[in-house]
Amino acid sequence: MKERLITDSYDGYELRYPFLVEHVKTQLEKQFWTATEARVDLDEVEMLYALTDEQRNVVKRLLPLFLRYELYVGSFWTDTYAKLFPCPEAQEAAVTVAMVERAIHARFYDKINKAFGLDKDIHYLSYLDDPAFKGRAKWIGDLLKSDD
């Protein structure tokens, strides 16, 4: 029988890449946290009272990009990685990392956005109004979708 590669599609479930299963186990059992656990009330106080107007403006302009990056990275794991590595262990790793990026990290950044009153599409999409931020977001998106 030919040795199965990580890039081979496989309908069975025999474990061949235990390091991927260990990664998933570590993520879910030792590193797992949720956006609801993370407190942002002190961030809100710091934003209001400790930052200068200029610093506040920078934070407000960067937050939508952080959220966008989390969504791009989540999509990379399900749309690119999962297609390149169709073995069961890689599929499990892909959906786990994508879940962390989308359901935890992106939700955490959104929690910050809500605390700062930046939770409307006018804010979420504001990076598109800045050519540098728009270019950066496009570059990251393209990079994560590339064949390289």
Could you describe each region identified by the protein language model?
Residues M1-D148:
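Non-heme di-metal
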